Amino acid sequence: MSDTASFRDTLEVFENPAPTRNFTIEHHCPEFTSVCPKTGQPDYGTIVFTYVPDRVCVELKSLKMYLQKFRNEGIFYEQVTNRILDDFVAVVQPRKVTVESKWTPRGGLNSNIIVTYPDEA
């Protein structure tokens, strides 16, 4: 697995234009690709970010470049979804965020992984 810091360094932010207001931003990234660590076959999915920014918002080109770094990574659905959330929280520091990965069916099964910050436990 590649170095977490080098992935996080790809993400850029800009100042929240309305930091005193709670508002929701939703980004859909329908061309996500990673590699199944068991089979070596590509996995395709959509990553959806739904977040309430605090001081900053994520810059979209950097988000696209960040997600493209996973293209050749052998990583399970659950692991990549949690890693994306952890990296997003570390850089953007949102008030709250949900990351959902929606995977293209494989072998007659499809998977959706949903992770949130802060934890809703």
Curated annotation (Swiss-Prot):
UniProt pathway annotation: tRNA modification; tRNA-queuosine biosynthesis
Ligand binding (substrate): 58-60, 77-78
GO biological process, any: queuosine biosynthetic process
SUPFAM superfamilies: Tetrahydrobiopterin biosynthesis enzymes-like (SSF55620)
Locations listed in the record: Cytoplasm
EC number: 1.7.1.13
Catalytic activity entry: 7-aminomethyl-7-carbaguanine + 2 NADP(+) = 7-cyano-7-deazaguanine + 2 NADPH + 3 H(+)
Molecular function in Gene Ontology: preQ1 synthase activity
Keyword Cytoplasm: yes
The entry's keywords: Cytoplasm, NADP, Oxidoreductase, Queuosine biosynthesis
Entry annotation: catalytic residues: 36, 43
InterPro entries (alphabetical): GTP-CH-I_C/QueF, NADPH_dep_7-cyano-7-deazaG_red, QueF, QueF_type1
Cellular component, GO, one term: cytosol
NCBIfam families the record matches: QueF-II
Family the entry assigns: Belongs to the GTP cyclohydrolase I family. QueF type 1 subfamily.
Its biological purpose: Catalyzes the NADPH-dependent reduction of 7-cyano-7-deazaguanine (preQ0) to 7-aminomethyl-7-deazaguanine (preQ1).
Protein known as: NADPH-dependent 7-cyano-7-deazaguanine reductase
Encoding gene (name): queF
